[in-house]
Amino acid sequence: MFKIFSLFLCTFFLGSTVNASNPLEAGSMSVCDCQPRDGGTITIATDWVLPYPWKSSEAHTYITPIYGNLYIGDPYNNELIPDLATHWEVSKDKTKGTFHLRKGVKFHDGTPFTAKDVEWSLKLTMKPEAEGSDFLMGAARLKELKGAQNFIDGKTKDIKGVNVIDDHTIVLETAVPNGQFFDVVGKVYILPEHIYTKYSWEELPKLDWMSPKVRVGTGPFKMEEFVEGQYVSYVANENYWAGRPHLDRIIFRLFAEHETGTLAFEKGEVDVLSFLTAEEVKRFGANPEGNIMLRGTPLSPNYINVTDMPYFQDKRVRQAISYAINRQQLIDTLIPGIRDPMDTLFPEGHPMYNPNAKRYPYDPEKARALLKEAGWDPNQVVDLSTYYTSQEALDWLAFVQMYLTRVGIKTKVRQMPWPDLEKAGQAGELELWLTGYSRDVIGDHMAYFGPEGTWNYGKYNNSKYHDLMTKASRSGGEELKKIFFEMQEIFNEELPAIPFWNRTKFNMVKPKICNAVEPWTDQHFGYRNFENTFICEDSKNVISVRPKTPTGLGHPGYLSP
């Protein structure tokens, strides 16, 4: 599946450079020998656009040019950079955050941005009827606002812990101390209250969100046109608060198949190609045309999620599935060099990796023995579902199916679009399903394994594990590491899901695209830096570099109130 990556200007980088001739060492930013210049269009390949963007976290990849956030996440060091909030303070007891909003900002329709828009956007994220909570994997943590549950349940029209002081000041208060909560708030995109309050929460998903009159934000680009099955186009926001972006237009061109998008990239019809397959990494690595390869995403695991069907209740069945998968063979055969085997929450080498947690090396005999002990019915056929669509995904699905068949678990592969898979999960119709994530580790775990998690289709509910997740959301440093170590010991014993590899993300950009960046981490949704990308047709020296931790990212306007 294609993903679209964010772009930004950064002037701090390492002296040594790398390029696509050695793709596995590729840097994460393209740097040209040109001065920034205005004008032009970039075309980015994607394979889907969700009409109602708040329904899925996947949507953020093509809406970041449109909307603003209170602050954005520095993708290199996870520091927070002011955006629609110029600054903020968190109380000593970590229960109250006061946000001071940027003055003079206007939405695309010319309406001034105020604190009421922040309040309404928080409500959208939390109100189940609006189907907006799926958009933010960390939405579960917003429930820690005072009075949040009463609002969610319809008992109150407002959230007690959200207080608008004036047009440019808003105070958020949590029920319990939680310093990390105020980081999560930055992930909420800010929408204009005045456009949507005329509709009920239930009506919002039914609006034409591809209309320039509905998709309105404060970002550097404005919605221009949507042609179903073909493309989505954005144009520069001439009145963007931080200054007009360099590009005139961004086009997200839709391809039903990844391979078709690759062909378009090779023909020069698109400028950005994302989520390269292993074969493409090898082929483009020769770099015959000077294309720039960008590498990122150090933590991006894939899992086989297990639902709460009666035949999966015995943990020995779940453990058998983990023993059944030959992770290293799967990687070496299909995608050498761009995946690492993984059988716990973090890959080996990650600072949070616990080497003492229960391990699951490839052992089909042990898998068969566990299934026999658990009374597994060898005639039982279970669905193995996914929303991934690429040939690479089909290949590794076939391998997983083969491994499970060898130990006595019969499966049937089901491919479906993400919205359909989500509906199946909500209806209790999923059995085994493959997915992945790469952003907020704590928020993801709450969404997948918390008792009220949006995607906890397995209904996993371990009170100790949930308590640890809650503690993790309020911790940092060595304390957080200890918590994650303990979480891995529980997770690897019970296996509410089966990790099998950690993927590395590779993208390609044409050499004329300057300041294109693949972040090293996806921990924050909010980075939005398309305004600093520019086109230089006559660049003689385009390189891929590894930036140092920058002192400030994005438009220079981010650095001052």
Tell where the protein language model's regions lie, with residue ranges.
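N-terminal lobe/hinge region of extracytoplasmic solute-binding protein
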Residues: 22-24, 28, 43-92, 123, ...
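Detector for C-terminal structural segments
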Residues: 24-26, 227, 324-353, 388, ...
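Alpha-helical secondary-structure segments
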Residues: 43, 114-123, 167-173, 177, ...
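A structural "hinge/loop" feature
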Residues: 45-64, 84, 111, 133-134, ...
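Gly/Pro-rich hinge or "lid" segments in bacterial periplasmic/extracellular proteins
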Residues: 74-75, 178-245, 249, 259, ...
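Aromatic- and charge-enriched surface segment that lines or borders ligand/interaction sites
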Residues: 87-137, 171, 261-264, 311
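Surface-exposed binding/hinge segments that line
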Residues: 119, 134-198
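Ligand-site clamp/hinge motif
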Residues: 124, 209-212, 237-283, 410-412
